[in-house]
């Protein structure tokens, strides 16, 4: 079974608009042909980003010239996707899969696939790959790369398995996505899960196993079960998001950026990005680079991504807030950037840090120890010289320099670090070390003592009583030891031990999940659709007037222990460094961590040229 007649009539594809028309036609069908669309995108990406030299020894391959916007009078060349080329690649893939999988050996009771069948399909893809190649290289995510080069990255393998299952008529097998990993769901209502690829640098994998153990660990890699369960249209969105326009470290293909942007708008208009927060963030980034007339602005799209995560995924996703923070950082909106980073830390605080979460660790490490210090350094420089951003540059916010005089900015900074410290509590792997402490002290020192003292840190007697118990040897070992890989598949992720006070700033997702406790209660800011607390909301003795500045309720034991140091007139750097790192060092000595592997690096996220 090859391409259908209606599909053939759309070829050849001579331009970006022709490719968009093909996608529109496929999205109009109940089952878009994932194999066809992936081959087309891979073909176009290869000749626009990998091999930009026009070959003269391939007579079937031609390039369509068109006027280039820059420089005026120049030409740009688009690789023509001829029917003969795409049909041959399509036939080769489908023949390879159907020839290797005998469906008669795998009965499908009730019309749903078995774990053995899914494992067999993944074996076919896995065994077809080259034995040795760099798994993190660019442009190896599509079926074009699989057919022509026998190379796929981690997410590409998972997508290839889903595409192969569709080619076999297994309509119940779909892609499942976290923010750094991919696997498949299958069975009645997609209730079953199966690993089909590796994660990180190594080839070690758990193919065929469920993801329940990872969910029970409360690791970010599996999002505590709040991962995306794709339908066919979302799988199309995934392949569009996976387009890599990078020609080299410093140059992107303008044509690929335009193609990706137009395809994402097509999916957006059809409603297929509603449950895809990272795709909305990707689209917002593209709109920031090249706005489309009559379309929502980037800030609106970033907030739509956050709303999607709250509505469908219990507000358990990190990257929607990271996208927003990156936008504000690039535009030097210091207060808004710090607030968004604080929100990312509020999300991560309910996870356990595991070795497979190294990608998000690197994100937080870069933000805390590079991006924020440099942003505050620039703000301090502007404050010293008296320069202020005004009007359109400030986009309605305070000037960058005056951010250091704003106690709410300082409160957001503290909330960010409180979330990181809370993330470490109960985790089998330590997070903080002296490198974090050095830059924390540096960032704290950017704020004058009188500004820091305007932030009121609430400490309730109930919290103090609770804090006395958990740090005994026996209790500490109980807190630190997270579920192991051998957890029973049926075990739900055990909740972290909550603080008695969830804080008046608790945001609540729009889904069925419980309210998320936040460490920050900064007046005038919102999260989860609720007003984040102000001084009037914080309990205080009846005779005391409410404080004027922002109010914080720390969730982590480390930040509770440092509360006096953080708002002191003079920064005691030695005491802060000792307090921030001491318990991490104890944890490293006492806890024997059983690590399944050293998994690292990214997936599903186009590398930015800079924040």
UniProtKB/Swiss-Prot annotation:
Keyword Transcription among record annotations: yes
Residues carrying Phosphoserine: 487, 544
Alphabetized UniProt keyword annotations: Chromatin regulator, DNA-binding, Nucleus, Phosphoprotein, Repressor, Transcription, Transcription regulation
GO terms assigned for molecular function: chromatin binding; DNA binding; DNA-binding transcription activator activity; sequence-specific DNA binding; transcription cis-regulatory region binding
Any one GO cellular component localisation term in the record: histone methyltransferase complex
Single biological process term from Gene Ontology: positive regulation of stem cell differentiation
Phenotype of null mutants: Homozygous mice die in utero at 11.5-12.5 dpc. At 9 months of age, heterozygous mice develop pancreatic islet lesions, from hyperplasia to insulin-producing islet cell tumors, and frequently parathyroid adenomas. Larger, more numerous tumors involving pancreatic islets, parathyroids, thyroid, adrenal cortex and pituitary are seen by 16 months. All tumors show loss of the wild-type allele.
Modified residues (Phosphothreonine): 595
Stretches of the chain forming a coiled coil according to its record: none
Region ranges (Disordered): 460-553
Expression sites by tissue: Widely expressed, with high levels in hippocampus, cerebral cortex, testis and thymus (at protein level). Also expressed at high levels in pancreatic islets, ovary and bone marrow. In the brain, highest expression in hippocampus pyramidal nerve cells (at protein level). In the testis, may be expressed in spermatogonia (at protein level). Low expression, if any, in skeletal muscle.
InterPro entries: Menin
Pfam families listed in its UniProt record: Menin
Cellular location(s): Nucleus
Region of interest (Interaction with FANCD2), residue spans: 214-390
Compositionally biased region (Basic and acidic residues): 484-500
Main localization (coarse): nucleus
Function: Essential component of a MLL/SET1 histone methyltransferase (HMT) complex, a complex that specifically methylates 'Lys-4' of histone H3 (H3K4). Functions as a transcriptional regulator. Binds to the TERT promoter and represses telomerase expression. Plays a role in TGFB1-mediated inhibition of cell-proliferation, possibly regulating SMAD3 transcriptional activity. Represses JUND-mediated transcriptional activation on AP1 sites, as well as that mediated by NFKB subunit RELA. Positively regulates HOXC8 and HOXC6 gene expression.
Quaternary structure note: Component of the MLL-HCF complex, at least composed of KMT2A/MLL1, MEN1, ASH2L, RBBP5, DPY30, WDR5, HCFC1 and HCFC2. Component of the menin-associated histone methyltransferase complex, at least composed of KMT2B/MLL4, MEN1, ASH2L, RBBP5, DPY30 and WDR5. Interacts with POLR2B. Interacts with POLR2A phosphorylated at 'Ser-5', but not with the unphosphorylated, nor 'Ser-2' phosphorylated POLR2A forms. Interacts with FANCD2 and DBF4. Interacts with SMAD3, but not with SMAD2, nor SMAD4. Directly interacts with NFKB1, NFKB2 and RELA.
PANTHER family reported in the protein's UniProt record: MENIN (PTHR12693:SF3)
Name of the protein in question: Menin
